[in-house]
Amino acid sequence: MVKLKNIKKNHDLISCDFFPEDAQNPGHIEYNIANDEVINCDYPEGYEWCDSHLSHAVDYLSSVANDDKMPESKLIMWY
């Protein structure tokens, strides 16, 4: 599970805070829409192993990249 909060789109950049699993403090993602790549990712301390969580978050950001309106938050769950 990963929670995305403060999702913001500014031209070709989407940024958000992300909380993998039970993290109390957020990490931060910056995703470049034009290049389809993460240009910055800061994991929350102690959650540096959460590459899978980052991948799910980026997949979601990519899927909404061309939407006119961004949600402010999103909960992503998988099994």
PLM features: residue spans?
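N-terminal acidic leader/helix
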Residues: 2-34
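Acidic, low-complexity intrinsically disordered segments
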Residues: 28-79
